[in-house]
Amino acid sequence: MLTVDVVALTGGSVPNLLLVQRAHPPFAGEWALPGGFVDEGERVADAAARELAEETGLKLASLCLLGVYDTPGRDPRGWTVSITYLAPLPAEAPVIGGDDAREARWCPADTLPKLAFDHATIIGDALVRWAEGPDRGRSPPPQGDR
């Protein structure tokens, strides 16, 4: 299964991260990054933007590739690969839980709740990228026909 996750963050040395409370199993009621399954025929970056909008109401035109997470057992539903994006923002935007999310909220990176899946690992990687400097995760746009 192919999924996407989005690490949206804003702030200074201790950024705030956008999390959603899951409405459905697995991990119903637990906090996670916005994300979900890629639809057949859908571009991965488009799926990330769609899931972010569906679950939080936040619409972004630009996302930066963070990494690929494929550790066996990361999802109890079966073998799943997540292509993960970083979305550095200049300020917190209003968000609202929707679709598969009961709630969406900004949380300080130093006081995160228990997270579903391997999202603590993903967030750790995102925070390293965030701390790297002024470009904070900016990457060149993807190549290919669009």
Please tell me what each predicted stretch does.
Residues 1-32, 45, 60:
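N-terminal strand-loop-strand
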Residues 38-130:
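Unchanged
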Residues 133-146:
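Polybasic "coupling" helices that flank or enter modular domains
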